[in-house]
């Protein structure tokens, strides 16, 4: 059988990944911002070489990429109805299609083809739709900073974990809260 010595959460796993990627050179306090498909977690950790200690952690169980996909589906459904006068039927624009379009929106405005219609969606429209979700994540970050009792200026870096951290609005939000550009050098979730 398998012997499990310790269970760790995703932000801690992300911190360990960055610690090992740096060959043990990291020392100090770090934030790990984990926004994946289904959940959001933020942790303040202390890293000393290969040792990672969680100082504070918080999260939102119902916030992730799936919610952003749903938001994009809503935009597409509204625009389709406006252009055609018809409701989209179940399965006309699937969650998988929304996820692919979301990834494209992280790079540029998009024009997905829905049935026979081309629907233009700008990144700013998408960002407007998800901004309230990002605001909740910001409040959670501020809460975990307060819980950690670590001064914002003592945090060395913010590590991004999870596919949804590729969304430019997410990165801007992290920069605004932590007053630094986040580190997104690797995709530890892949």
Predicted region positions:
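Oxyanion-binding/catalytic loops of NTP- or PPi-dependent enzymes
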Residues: 1-190
């Amino acid at each position: 059988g398998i012997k499990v010595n310790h269970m760790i959460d995703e932000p801690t796993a992300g911190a360990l990944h960055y610690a090992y990627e740096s060959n043990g050179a990291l020392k100090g306090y770090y934030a790990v911002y984990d926004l994946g498909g289904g959940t959001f977690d933020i942790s303040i950790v202390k890293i000393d070489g290969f040792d990672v200690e969680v100082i504070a952690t918080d999260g939102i169980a119902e916030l992730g990429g799936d919610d952003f996909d749903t938001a994009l589906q809503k935009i597409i459904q509204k625009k389709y109805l406006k252009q055609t006068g018809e409701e989209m039927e179940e399965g006309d624009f699937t969650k998988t299609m929304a996820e692919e379009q979301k990834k494209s929106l992280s790079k540029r405005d998009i024009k997905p083809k829905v049935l026979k219609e081309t629907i233009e969606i700008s990144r700013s429209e998408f960002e407007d739709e998800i901004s309230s979700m990002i605001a909740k994540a910001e409040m959670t970050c501020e809460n975990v900073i307060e819980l950690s009792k670590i001064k914002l200026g003592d945090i060395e870096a913010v590590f991004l974990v999870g596919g949804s951290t590729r969304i430019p609005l997410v990165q801007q939000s992290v920069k605004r809260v932590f007053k630094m550009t986040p580190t997104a050098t690797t995709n530890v979730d892949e």
